[in-house]
Amino acid sequence: MKKRNFINLSDINKKDLNRILKRAKSLKVLRTKGKSIKKTLERNNLAMIFEKPSTRTRVSFELAIKELGGNAIILDENTTHLARGETIADTARVLERYCHIFMVRTNKHSKLLDYDKYSKVPIVNGLSNISHPCQILADIMTYEENRGSIKNNSGTPVIGKYCLRLF
């Protein structure tokens, strides 16, 4: 099975976008009502690799994986051998033995591509100098919850050029 990354918004199509948003809204309702959430990620480990500080991204990812039954491992360059010159290739190969997915928050988009190149597990972009696709999804969800569909009456998205191809 081919791994599916979420490095750029272009990694998902309209159908996937709608499915992700629908699932996120459903999970939010369950969480808000205090209802149990199916543990669909039980026995899955998420490696969260941070090169830059984060509050919302870290909390969101860590709570999400835990609520879905998985585990989060938080790493940064100061607590791994990356600080001593270990290559991304070596780090990726070691981590993929233990983790099922990586979330990387980096200063250089090219590092996301390196993690993709050297690992067999999916890569999620937690923010790079080029894009922040998870934030775009969160913004779309927030907009729709507060103002309705992101499409105007003519069917054209009102969010911006990056979303145009999705609708």
Where are these regions (language model features)?
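Hydrophobic beta-strand scaffold residues
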Residues: 72-74, 102, 123
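Active-site cofactor/substrate anionic-group-binding motifs, chiefly glycine-
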Residues: 45-46, 50-98
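Glycine-rich phosphate/diphosphate-binding loop of Rossmann-like nucleotide-binding domains
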Residues: 50-64, 144-167
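A glycine-rich, Thr/Ser-enriched phosphate-binding loop motif common to dinucleotide/cofactor-binding enzymes
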Residues: 26, 101, 126-142
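A glycine-rich helix N-cap at a beta->alpha junction
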Residues: 96-108
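Positively charged, low-complexity intrinsically disordered leader regions
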Residues: 1-59, 63
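Helix-enriched interaction subdomains in cytosolic or periplasmic regions
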Residues: 1-22, 106-133
